[in-house]
Amino acid sequence: MPKQIHEIKDFLLTARRKDARTVKIKKNKDMVKFKVRCSKYLYTLCVSDFEKADKLKQSLPPGLSVQDL
């Protein structure tokens, strides 16, 4: 089941959880979507600023598998 996260801090906390498995990054022409798969939900964060998206991609946990779509 999907859930949307609106704050970057909340997304980073969710990505650092023990049950977080993968992060998928989808790029459109006007926004970047970060999707983290946890055991129960698929959490989505939509970022319209591409510079913030690059910083967020660099600050993801290193043990998490990241896929660019």
UniProtKB/Swiss-Prot annotation:
The keyword Cell membrane belongs to this UniProt entry's keyword annotation: no
Recorded family membership: Belongs to the eukaryotic ribosomal protein eL38 family.
InterPro entries: Ribosomal_eL38, Ribosomal_eL38_sf
GO BP, sorted A to Z: protein-RNA complex assembly; translation
Keyword line: Ribonucleoprotein, Ribosomal protein
Gene: RPL38
GO MF terms held by the record: structural constituent of ribosome
Domain of life: Eukaryota
One GO cellular component term: cytosolic large ribosomal subunit
Cell wall biogenesis/degradation recorded as keyword: no
Protein name in the entry: Large ribosomal subunit protein eL38
